[in-house]
Amino acid sequence: MDVDVIGIGAGSPSHISLEAIGALADVDVVFALDKGDAKADLLAARQAIVDKHAPHVELVAVPDPPRDRTPDNYGAVVRDWHQRRAELLADAFVAHLGREGKRRGAFLVWGDPSLYDSTLRILQRVRDLGVDVRSRVIPSVTAISALTAAHGECLNQIGKPVLITTGRRLGERTPGTDAVVMLDGGAAWLEHADPEEEILWGAFLGTELETLRRGRVGDVGEEIAELKKELRAEHGWIMDIYLLRSGA
């Protein structure tokens, strides 16, 4: 059976590419992991894309199994979570696509499928369960490019590397290394960034809720941390990303 992985950009409906629209037109069923009422906006955004570009497509929501968000053994917990997701999705594929492969499925992935997204790994786990899944992968606008564009800045400084990491791993960064930080459930910059570093922060990029802040960590770090708490409390969820960089 065929299950495509289609990048839909960082949040704006305009981020979806002509290639992605063409791929979506070939699809019969879009699968989505349903994260509950707190993140219903994410499911609604996918439904809006389907309604606009491929109204013939059925959206199937598969309940996302819960997991511990602050585990002692992060890797083992996430691998177990991915396995449980794969088992649920394997059943959904068979139920809605059929083993004979006459229907085509897809996932609509925020940002680009290659960057801090688990869909491709989970599909491999589905294959390991004995379900023959073939996938096209359609790239798209990343949260990184949406962040730098929103701030009107280049990602890298001349002759300097950029680390892409998570909030959980920010403390392992070599001092002075510029870094893009994703999947920060808290405010790791308060503990692991130099007060003299500049932070370029954005939340809900590309949406009507887009919120941007920038400045020295020592000047705006606490403000951004409080703002992030307020936005999460107001909307029930938040997607944010930031760039930390030292002086040129």
State the predicted function of each range.
Residues M1-V133, R214-E222, R232-A248:
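Class I S-adenosyl-L-methionine
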Residues V3, R173-A248:
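A contiguous loop/helix-start segment that scaffolds small-molecule binding in enzyme catalytic cores
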Residues D37-A40, V141-S145, A188, T207-L209:
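Short gly/pro/ser/thr-enriched loop/turn and capping motifs at secondary-structure boundaries
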Residues P65-P71, I144, L170-E172, G206-L209:
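A short acidic, often aromatic-flanked loop/helix-cap motif at beta-alpha or helix-coil junctions
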